[in-house]
Swiss-Prot record:
This is tRNA pseudouridine synthase B. Its EC number is 5.4.99.25. NCBIfam families: TruB (TIGR00431). InterPro entries: PsdUridine_synth_cat_dom_sf, PsdUridine_synth_N, tRNA_psdUridine_synth_TruB, TruB_C. Responsible for synthesis of pseudouridine from uracil-55 in the psi GC loop of transfer RNAs. GO terms for biological process: mRNA pseudouridine synthesis; tRNA pseudouridine synthesis. It is an enzyme of class 5 (isomerase). GO terms for molecular function: RNA binding; tRNA pseudouridine(55) synthase activity.
Length: 298
């Protein structure tokens, strides 16, 4: 598809991503369909994963870091008895085991994977190693030892167990790899494992029910897709909202500290609006907000 300059359009389209397509390809499809000048996404999904992919348009891209840092929830199936090169079903089998865990053993192991944990990303991942993506190095046959990174796991719940697989739900913070959880849980249980299926069911304030089916994008016209857009501020649900005074709004839109009504903790990150229009994200400084990202909505 040829590159187009695009038009100014702002907001979020929550796409229900199917398996077999990359997150950046989804963003490109949305941008093309809406003739949008600017687009991005908050939180990459593996090509084989499905579910909530939040696509930001225009000034909503300035709120992507907020959503990227938000908790996200995943439903996934772990297949026991084999570890793969990618830690999911797309990779080749590298180790096998005849052992199988019972439900009690699985439940007993889960607490070790909750709270603040250290996680080694999959060898085939977007993590950068000396400037190169780990998955590019893996394709070139280079063996890369990735360093463990901290991850907050809010909860890890067993939804169901069979002899050769288990269904789980994980709620975690930024940078979590479900594939690593499946791999490490399989090792802990002595049976090995990999992700067979993975679906993101919510991301911050956005849920699967908000999702616009990916295959509808080609069939729908621009007006139908625009009707599904959520406002820019939908991603800011976890931040306190402050109301700017008339003079404060003018100052904020010029990048200066502006007067607001209400109170928050000194230095707390907030977002500011005036007459229903989002103005900025910034820090509350006692009666004023110092903007860090101003929304130029025209």
């Amino acid at each position: 598809m040829a590159r187009k300059k695009g038009r100014e359009i702002h907001g979020w389209l929550i796409v229900d991503k199917p398996a077999g397509i990359g997150s950046t390809d989804v963003v490109g499809k949305v941008r093309w369909a809406l003739d949008a000048k600017k687009a991005g996404h908050a939180g990459t999904l593996d090509p084989d994963a499905t579910g909530v992919l939040a696509v930001a348009l225009g000034e909503a891209t300035k709120t992507v870091p907020i959503l990227t840092d938000a908790l996200k929830a995943y439903d996934f199936t772990v297949s026991w008895g084999a570890e793969t090169s990618t830690d999911d079903a797309s990779g080749g089998v590298v180790k096998t085991s005849d052992a199988r865990p019972d439900e009690a053993a699985i439940r007993a192991a889960l607490p070790e994977f909750t709270g603040e944990i250290m996680q080694v990303p999959p060898a085939v991942s977007a993590v950068r190693v000396d400037g190169a993506r780990a998955y590019d190095l893996a394709r070139e046959g280079e063996v890369v030892e990735l360093a463990a990174r901290p991850l907050w796991v809010e909860s890890l719940e067993l939804l169901g167990a069979a002899r050769d697989s288990a269904e789980l739900r994980m709620v975690c913070g930024k940078g979590g790899y479900v594939r690593s959880i499946a791999r490490d849980l399989g090792r802990k249980l002595g049976c090995l494992g990999h992700v067979a299926q993975l679906r993101r069911i919510w991301s911050g304030p956005f849920e699967a029910g908000d999702g616009f089916a990916f295959d509808r994008i080609d069939r729908a016209n621009q007006a139908e897709i625009e009707a599904a857009l959520l406002p820019l501020q939908a991603a800011l649900a976890d931040l306190p909202e402050m109301q700017a005074t008339e003079i404060g709004a003018t100052r904020i839109l010029n990048g200066n500290p502006g007067q607001v009504l209400g109170h928050a903790e000194f230095g707390e990150e907030v977002w500011v609006s005036r007459n229903g229009r989002a103005l900025c994200i910034g820090r509350y400084m006692g009666g004023e907000v110092q903007p860090s990202r101003v929304f130029n909505l025209g």
